[in-house]
Amino acid sequence: EMCIRDSLKGMIALLSEHIYSNPNTFVRELLQNCVDAITALRNIDENYKGRIDVFLNEDKTVVFRDNGVGLKEEEVYRFLTVIGESSKRDTPDADDFIGRFGIGLLSCFVVTNEITVESRSAMGGQPVCWCGKVDGTYQLTLSDEERPIGSQVVLHPKGDWMHLFEYETFKKILVSYGEVLPYPIYLHYQGEEELVNTPSPVWLDPKATRKELLDYGAKVFQSSALDAFRIYTESGKVEGVLYVLPFRTQFSVRNSHKVYLKRMLLSEDDCNLLPPWAFFIRCLVNADGLLSTASRESLVSNDQLKDARKEIGVAIKDYLRGLVQNDRAMFNRILDVHHFHIKAIASEDNELLRLFMDYLPFETNKGLRSFGSIRSASNVICYTTVSYTHLT
Protein backbone atom coordinates (compact mmCIF):
# COMPACT_ATOMS: atom_id res chain seq x y z
CA GLU A 1 0.00 0.00 0.00
CA MET A 2 1.07 3.57 -0.72
CA CYS A 3 -0.14 6.84 0.77
CA ILE A 4 -1.75 9.72 -1.08
CA ARG A 5 0.89 12.43 -1.25
CA ASP A 6 0.56 15.77 0.56
CA SER A 7 -2.21 14.38 2.72
CA LEU A 8 -3.05 12.61 5.91
CA LYS A 9 -6.31 11.19 7.13
CA GLY A 10 -7.12 14.57 8.66
CA MET A 11 -6.66 16.34 5.32
CA ILE A 12 -9.10 13.98 3.62
CA ALA A 13 -11.57 14.51 6.46
CA LEU A 14 -11.22 18.28 6.09
CA LEU A 15 -11.90 18.23 2.37
CA SER A 16 -14.57 15.56 2.30
CA GLU A 17 -16.54 16.61 5.36
CA HIS A 18 -16.09 20.38 5.66
CA ILE A 19 -15.67 21.87 2.18
CA TYR A 20 -18.76 20.01 0.99
CA SER A 21 -21.83 20.91 3.04
CA ASN A 22 -24.16 18.31 1.52
CA PRO A 23 -23.57 14.53 1.61
CA ASN A 24 -25.30 14.28 -1.79
CA THR A 25 -22.34 16.13 -3.31
CA PHE A 26 -20.62 12.89 -4.33
CA VAL A 27 -23.25 12.37 -7.05
CA ARG A 28 -22.50 15.78 -8.52
CA GLU A 29 -18.75 15.24 -8.42
CA LEU A 30 -18.90 11.82 -10.07
CA LEU A 31 -21.24 13.09 -12.78
CA GLN A 32 -18.89 16.02 -13.34
CA ASN A 33 -15.95 13.66 -13.82
CA CYS A 34 -17.96 11.62 -16.34
CA VAL A 35 -19.01 14.70 -18.31
CA ASP A 36 -15.50 16.15 -18.39
CA ALA A 37 -14.02 12.82 -19.54
CA ILE A 38 -16.48 12.64 -22.43
CA THR A 39 -15.92 16.30 -23.29
CA ALA A 40 -12.16 15.69 -23.44
CA LEU A 41 -12.70 12.93 -26.00
CA ARG A 42 -15.19 15.02 -27.99
CA ASN A 43 -12.58 17.78 -28.22
CA ILE A 44 -10.57 15.24 -30.23
CA ASP A 45 -13.54 13.79 -32.14
CA GLU A 46 -16.56 16.12 -32.19
CA ASN A 47 -18.82 13.34 -33.49
CA TYR A 48 -18.07 11.01 -30.59
CA LYS A 49 -21.22 9.81 -28.81
CA GLY A 50 -20.77 9.94 -25.07
CA ARG A 51 -22.98 8.36 -22.43
CA ILE A 52 -23.03 7.88 -18.68
CA ASP A 53 -24.32 4.73 -16.99
CA VAL A 54 -25.07 4.61 -13.28
CA PHE A 55 -25.69 1.23 -11.64
CA LEU A 56 -27.50 0.99 -8.30
CA ASN A 57 -27.01 -2.58 -7.18
CA GLU A 58 -29.04 -4.69 -4.76
CA ASP A 59 -26.27 -4.48 -2.15
CA LYS A 60 -26.51 -0.66 -2.46
CA THR A 61 -23.11 -0.39 -4.11
CA VAL A 62 -23.14 2.22 -6.85
CA VAL A 63 -21.12 2.40 -10.06
CA PHE A 64 -20.64 5.50 -12.21
CA ARG A 65 -19.40 4.57 -15.70
CA ASP A 66 -18.50 6.77 -18.67
CA ASN A 67 -17.07 6.14 -22.14
CA GLY A 68 -14.84 9.20 -21.98
CA VAL A 69 -11.11 9.70 -22.45
CA GLY A 70 -9.99 7.54 -19.50
CA LEU A 71 -6.69 7.65 -17.58
CA LYS A 72 -3.28 6.12 -18.19
CA GLU A 73 -1.10 4.79 -15.36
CA GLU A 74 1.00 7.96 -15.06
CA GLU A 75 -2.17 10.08 -15.07
CA VAL A 76 -3.61 8.03 -12.22
CA TYR A 77 -0.42 8.63 -10.22
CA ARG A 78 -0.59 12.34 -10.93
CA PHE A 79 -4.28 13.09 -10.61
CA LEU A 80 -5.60 10.55 -8.09
CA THR A 81 -2.70 10.38 -5.65
CA VAL A 82 -2.09 14.11 -5.15
CA ILE A 83 -4.78 16.22 -3.53
CA GLY A 84 -5.43 19.34 -5.58
CA GLU A 85 -4.06 18.04 -8.89
CA SER A 86 -6.48 18.28 -11.80
CA SER A 87 -6.17 17.03 -15.36
CA LYS A 88 -8.31 19.93 -16.55
CA ARG A 89 -7.03 23.11 -14.94
CA ASP A 90 -4.13 24.04 -17.25
CA THR A 91 -5.23 22.50 -20.55
CA PRO A 92 -6.09 24.61 -23.64
CA ASP A 93 -9.67 23.31 -23.33
CA ALA A 94 -9.97 24.12 -19.60
CA ASP A 95 -13.00 26.36 -20.16
CA ASP A 96 -14.94 23.37 -21.54
CA PHE A 97 -14.73 21.46 -18.26
CA ILE A 98 -16.85 21.70 -15.13
CA GLY A 99 -14.14 20.66 -12.65
CA ARG A 100 -10.76 22.29 -12.11
CA PHE A 101 -9.71 21.87 -8.46
CA GLY A 102 -8.76 18.19 -8.28
CA ILE A 103 -10.53 17.54 -4.98
CA GLY A 104 -14.03 16.47 -6.06
CA LEU A 105 -13.42 12.72 -5.80
CA LEU A 106 -12.74 13.16 -2.09
CA SER A 107 -16.39 14.11 -1.53
CA CYS A 108 -17.10 10.38 -1.93
CA PHE A 109 -15.37 9.74 1.40
CA VAL A 110 -18.35 11.36 3.12
CA VAL A 111 -20.44 8.30 2.18
CA THR A 112 -17.82 5.56 1.72
CA ASN A 113 -14.54 4.36 3.21
CA GLU A 114 -13.20 3.09 -0.12
CA ILE A 115 -13.21 4.35 -3.70
CA THR A 116 -12.33 2.09 -6.63
CA VAL A 117 -11.51 3.64 -10.02
CA GLU A 118 -11.09 1.40 -13.06
CA SER A 119 -9.99 3.09 -16.27
CA ARG A 120 -8.68 2.55 -19.78
CA SER A 121 -7.28 5.51 -21.69
CA ALA A 122 -8.32 6.32 -25.24
CA MET A 123 -4.68 7.35 -25.73
CA GLY A 124 -3.40 3.80 -25.20
CA GLY A 125 -1.79 1.88 -22.36
CA GLN A 126 -3.00 -0.90 -20.07
CA PRO A 127 -6.21 -0.67 -18.07
CA VAL A 128 -5.57 0.49 -14.50
CA CYS A 129 -7.34 -0.06 -11.19
CA TRP A 130 -6.88 2.42 -8.34
CA CYS A 131 -8.34 1.74 -4.90
CA GLY A 132 -8.16 4.58 -2.38
CA LYS A 133 -9.13 4.37 1.29
CA VAL A 134 -10.26 7.00 3.76
CA ASP A 135 -7.05 6.56 5.80
CA GLY A 136 -5.07 8.00 2.89
CA THR A 137 -3.63 4.74 1.53
CA TYR A 138 -4.17 3.40 -1.96
CA GLN A 139 -3.30 0.50 -4.25
CA LEU A 140 -2.67 0.73 -7.98
CA THR A 141 -2.64 -2.30 -10.26
CA LEU A 142 -2.45 -2.85 -14.01
CA SER A 143 -4.66 -5.30 -15.88
CA ASP A 144 -4.25 -7.34 -19.05
CA GLU A 145 -8.00 -7.80 -19.35
CA GLU A 146 -9.86 -6.11 -22.16
CA ARG A 147 -12.17 -3.35 -21.04
CA PRO A 148 -13.89 -0.55 -22.94
CA ILE A 149 -12.38 2.92 -23.15
CA GLY A 150 -13.47 5.11 -20.27
CA SER A 151 -13.69 4.92 -16.50
CA GLN A 152 -15.91 3.60 -13.77
CA VAL A 153 -16.01 4.48 -10.08
CA VAL A 154 -17.33 1.99 -7.53
CA LEU A 155 -18.53 3.01 -4.05
CA HIS A 156 -19.51 0.86 -1.06
CA PRO A 157 -21.61 3.13 1.16
CA LYS A 158 -21.10 3.55 4.90
CA GLY A 159 -23.90 2.33 7.12
CA ASP A 160 -24.82 5.86 8.19
CA TRP A 161 -25.55 6.84 4.60
CA MET A 162 -27.32 3.74 3.28
CA HIS A 163 -30.57 5.71 3.00
CA LEU A 164 -29.05 7.83 0.20
CA PHE A 165 -28.76 4.67 -1.89
CA GLU A 166 -32.43 3.73 -1.71
CA TYR A 167 -33.75 3.75 -5.26
CA GLU A 168 -36.21 6.66 -5.08
CA THR A 169 -33.87 8.81 -2.99
CA PHE A 170 -30.86 8.12 -5.19
CA LYS A 171 -32.80 8.71 -8.41
CA LYS A 172 -34.05 12.07 -7.11
CA ILE A 173 -30.48 13.17 -6.32
CA LEU A 174 -29.21 11.94 -9.70
CA VAL A 175 -31.94 13.78 -11.60
CA SER A 176 -31.44 16.94 -9.55
CA TYR A 177 -27.79 17.27 -10.51
CA GLY A 178 -27.82 15.67 -13.94
CA GLU A 179 -31.16 16.67 -15.44
CA VAL A 180 -29.77 19.00 -18.12
CA LEU A 181 -26.25 17.64 -18.60
CA PRO A 182 -25.39 17.38 -22.31
CA TYR A 183 -24.85 13.61 -22.44
CA PRO A 184 -27.47 10.92 -21.78
CA ILE A 185 -27.47 9.44 -18.27
CA TYR A 186 -28.94 5.97 -17.77
CA LEU A 187 -29.85 4.62 -14.35
CA HIS A 188 -29.69 0.82 -14.07
CA TYR A 189 -31.71 -0.84 -11.31
CA GLN A 190 -33.01 -4.39 -10.98
CA GLY A 191 -32.21 -5.14 -14.61
CA GLU A 192 -34.03 -2.09 -15.94
CA GLU A 193 -32.40 0.86 -17.73
CA GLU A 194 -33.93 4.35 -17.52
CA LEU A 195 -32.90 7.63 -19.15
CA VAL A 196 -33.02 10.21 -16.35
CA ASN A 197 -32.04 13.46 -18.05
CA THR A 198 -33.06 15.74 -20.91
CA PRO A 199 -29.94 16.86 -22.79
CA SER A 200 -32.02 19.48 -24.68
CA PRO A 201 -34.27 21.12 -22.04
CA VAL A 202 -37.02 23.47 -23.17
CA TRP A 203 -35.72 26.39 -21.12
CA LEU A 204 -32.48 26.41 -23.14
CA ASP A 205 -34.37 26.24 -26.44
CA PRO A 206 -34.48 29.73 -28.05
CA LYS A 207 -37.59 28.65 -29.98
CA ALA A 208 -39.59 27.76 -26.85
CA THR A 209 -42.89 29.60 -26.49
CA ARG A 210 -43.89 31.67 -23.48
CA LYS A 211 -46.43 28.99 -22.54
CA GLU A 212 -43.79 26.24 -22.69
CA LEU A 213 -41.49 28.27 -20.45
CA LEU A 214 -44.29 29.00 -17.98
CA ASP A 215 -45.37 25.36 -17.87
CA TYR A 216 -41.80 24.20 -17.30
CA GLY A 217 -41.25 26.78 -14.56
CA ALA A 218 -44.44 25.72 -12.79
CA LYS A 219 -43.22 22.12 -12.81
CA VAL A 220 -39.70 22.92 -11.60
CA PHE A 221 -40.60 25.45 -8.90
CA GLN A 222 -44.00 24.01 -7.95
CA SER A 223 -45.41 27.49 -8.42
CA SER A 224 -46.91 29.42 -11.31
CA ALA A 225 -45.47 32.70 -12.57
CA LEU A 226 -47.01 35.87 -13.97
CA ASP A 227 -44.68 35.84 -16.94
CA ALA A 228 -41.40 34.45 -18.26
CA PHE A 229 -38.73 35.90 -20.54
CA ARG A 230 -35.38 34.74 -21.89
CA ILE A 231 -32.01 36.34 -21.17
CA TYR A 232 -28.44 36.00 -22.40
CA THR A 233 -25.31 37.81 -21.19
CA GLU A 234 -22.00 38.23 -22.98
CA SER A 235 -20.17 38.35 -19.67
CA GLY A 236 -20.19 34.91 -18.10
CA LYS A 237 -22.32 33.51 -20.94
CA VAL A 238 -25.41 33.29 -18.74
CA GLU A 239 -28.46 31.94 -20.57
CA GLY A 240 -31.91 30.95 -19.43
CA VAL A 241 -35.27 32.19 -18.24
CA LEU A 242 -36.39 34.74 -15.67
CA TYR A 243 -39.81 34.27 -14.08
CA VAL A 244 -41.94 37.06 -12.60
CA LEU A 245 -43.34 35.90 -9.28
CA PRO A 246 -47.14 35.98 -8.94
CA PHE A 247 -47.08 37.16 -5.32
CA ARG A 248 -45.68 40.16 -3.47
CA THR A 249 -42.28 39.50 -1.92
CA GLN A 250 -40.35 41.07 0.93
CA PHE A 251 -36.94 42.60 0.31
CA SER A 252 -35.49 40.38 3.04
CA VAL A 253 -36.96 37.08 1.77
CA ARG A 254 -34.80 34.89 -0.48
CA ASN A 255 -36.62 33.06 -3.24
CA SER A 256 -35.71 29.67 -4.67
CA HIS A 257 -33.87 29.61 -7.99
CA LYS A 258 -31.93 27.13 -10.10
CA VAL A 259 -28.45 28.12 -11.22
CA TYR A 260 -26.45 25.70 -13.38
CA LEU A 261 -22.76 25.93 -14.23
CA LYS A 262 -21.93 24.27 -17.55
CA ARG A 263 -25.33 22.57 -17.15
CA MET A 264 -24.53 21.00 -13.77
CA LEU A 265 -26.79 22.17 -10.94
CA LEU A 266 -24.80 24.59 -8.80
CA SER A 267 -27.28 26.13 -6.38
CA GLU A 268 -30.91 26.90 -5.60
CA ASP A 269 -29.80 30.38 -4.61
CA ASP A 270 -29.39 33.13 -7.21
CA CYS A 271 -25.60 33.17 -6.52
CA ASN A 272 -25.64 37.00 -6.73
CA LEU A 273 -26.59 36.90 -10.41
CA LEU A 274 -29.67 39.05 -9.82
CA PRO A 275 -29.47 42.76 -8.98
CA PRO A 276 -30.35 43.52 -5.34
CA TRP A 277 -33.68 45.10 -6.34
CA ALA A 278 -34.90 42.09 -8.38
CA PHE A 279 -36.72 40.33 -5.54
CA PHE A 280 -39.75 39.77 -7.77
CA ILE A 281 -37.71 37.63 -10.19
CA ARG A 282 -36.93 33.92 -10.03
CA CYS A 283 -34.13 32.64 -12.28
CA LEU A 284 -33.55 29.37 -14.11
CA VAL A 285 -30.20 29.91 -15.79
CA ASN A 286 -27.02 28.22 -16.95
CA ALA A 287 -23.62 29.93 -16.93
CA ASP A 288 -20.92 28.63 -19.24
CA GLY A 289 -18.36 31.36 -18.57
CA LEU A 290 -18.36 31.92 -14.80
CA LEU A 291 -16.24 30.24 -12.13
CA SER A 292 -17.38 28.25 -9.11
CA THR A 293 -15.88 28.16 -5.65
CA ALA A 294 -13.96 25.05 -4.56
CA SER A 295 -17.11 23.56 -3.02
CA ARG A 296 -18.97 24.15 -6.31
CA GLU A 297 -21.94 25.46 -4.37
CA SER A 298 -21.66 29.14 -5.36
CA LEU A 299 -20.05 31.43 -7.93
CA VAL A 300 -16.75 33.23 -7.48
CA SER A 301 -17.35 36.93 -6.85
CA ASN A 302 -15.29 38.64 -9.54
CA ASP A 303 -15.62 41.22 -12.33
CA GLN A 304 -17.23 38.67 -14.65
CA LEU A 305 -20.01 37.99 -12.16
CA LYS A 306 -20.46 41.72 -11.55
CA ASP A 307 -20.73 42.42 -15.28
CA ALA A 308 -23.15 39.51 -15.78
CA ARG A 309 -25.35 40.90 -12.98
CA LYS A 310 -25.37 44.32 -14.68
CA GLU A 311 -26.41 42.74 -17.98
CA ILE A 312 -29.22 40.83 -16.28
CA GLY A 313 -30.38 44.07 -14.66
CA VAL A 314 -30.49 45.74 -18.07
CA ALA A 315 -32.43 42.75 -19.47
CA ILE A 316 -35.07 43.07 -16.72
CA LYS A 317 -35.45 46.80 -17.38
CA ASP A 318 -35.68 46.19 -21.14
CA TYR A 319 -38.36 43.57 -20.52
CA LEU A 320 -40.46 45.98 -18.45
CA ARG A 321 -39.92 48.76 -21.00
CA GLY A 322 -41.13 46.41 -23.72
CA LEU A 323 -44.27 45.59 -21.76
CA VAL A 324 -45.14 49.27 -21.36
CA GLN A 325 -44.86 49.71 -25.10
CA ASN A 326 -46.31 46.41 -26.34
CA ASP A 327 -48.24 44.58 -23.60
CA ARG A 328 -49.81 47.09 -21.23
CA ALA A 329 -52.15 44.49 -19.75
CA MET A 330 -49.24 42.32 -18.57
CA PHE A 331 -47.39 45.36 -17.26
CA ASN A 332 -50.45 46.37 -15.24
CA ARG A 333 -50.74 42.84 -13.79
CA ILE A 334 -47.10 42.95 -12.71
CA LEU A 335 -47.50 46.50 -11.40
CA ASP A 336 -50.50 45.49 -9.27
CA VAL A 337 -48.33 42.94 -7.44
CA HIS A 338 -44.83 44.41 -7.59
CA HIS A 339 -45.19 48.21 -7.69
CA PHE A 340 -42.81 48.60 -4.72
CA HIS A 341 -40.04 46.81 -6.63
CA ILE A 342 -40.72 48.70 -9.84
CA LYS A 343 -40.52 51.96 -7.89
CA ALA A 344 -37.13 50.80 -6.61
CA ILE A 345 -35.97 50.19 -10.20
CA ALA A 346 -37.31 53.54 -11.39
CA SER A 347 -35.66 55.39 -8.51
CA GLU A 348 -32.19 54.46 -9.83
CA ASP A 349 -32.88 54.90 -13.55
CA ASN A 350 -34.14 58.27 -14.77
CA GLU A 351 -35.14 56.91 -18.17
CA LEU A 352 -37.33 54.23 -16.62
CA LEU A 353 -38.67 56.73 -14.10
CA ARG A 354 -39.98 58.87 -16.96
CA LEU A 355 -41.38 55.77 -18.68
CA PHE A 356 -43.08 54.23 -15.64
CA MET A 357 -43.99 57.31 -13.63
CA ASP A 358 -47.55 57.80 -14.81
CA TYR A 359 -48.39 54.14 -14.09
CA LEU A 360 -46.95 53.89 -10.58
CA PRO A 361 -49.56 53.80 -7.78
CA PHE A 362 -49.36 56.10 -4.76
CA GLU A 363 -51.45 56.25 -1.60
CA THR A 364 -53.42 59.52 -1.46
CA ASN A 365 -56.16 61.09 0.63
CA LYS A 366 -58.52 59.83 -2.07
CA GLY A 367 -57.24 56.26 -2.09
CA LEU A 368 -54.65 54.48 -4.22
CA ARG A 369 -54.17 56.36 -7.51
CA SER A 370 -51.68 56.29 -10.36
CA PHE A 371 -49.34 59.24 -10.62
CA GLY A 372 -50.77 60.02 -14.06
CA SER A 373 -54.21 60.35 -12.50
CA ILE A 374 -52.86 62.54 -9.70
CA ARG A 375 -51.00 64.77 -12.14
CA SER A 376 -53.98 65.22 -14.45
CA ALA A 377 -56.21 66.21 -11.54
CA SER A 378 -54.15 69.21 -10.41
CA ASN A 379 -51.15 71.31 -11.30
CA VAL A 380 -50.17 71.38 -7.62
CA ILE A 381 -49.26 68.14 -5.86
CA CYS A 382 -48.65 68.10 -2.12
CA TYR A 383 -46.87 65.13 -0.60
CA THR A 384 -45.65 63.95 2.79
CA THR A 385 -42.33 62.40 3.70
CA VAL A 386 -44.01 59.79 5.92
CA SER A 387 -46.80 57.32 5.26
CA TYR A 388 -50.22 58.96 4.96
CA THR A 389 -52.73 58.01 7.65
CA HIS A 390 -56.39 58.92 7.33
CA LEU A 391 -57.78 60.22 10.62
CA THR A 392 -61.47 59.87 11.47
Segments from the language model and where they lie:
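GHKL/Bergerat-fold ATPase module in large chromosome/replication-associated machines
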Residues: 97, 117-139, 158-163, 168-391
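Residue-level detector of conserved catalytic or cofactor/ligand-binding positions
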Residues: 1-6, 386, 390-392
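GHKL (Bergerat-fold) ATPase N-terminal catalytic module, capturing the glycine-rich phosphate-binding loop
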Residues: 1-165
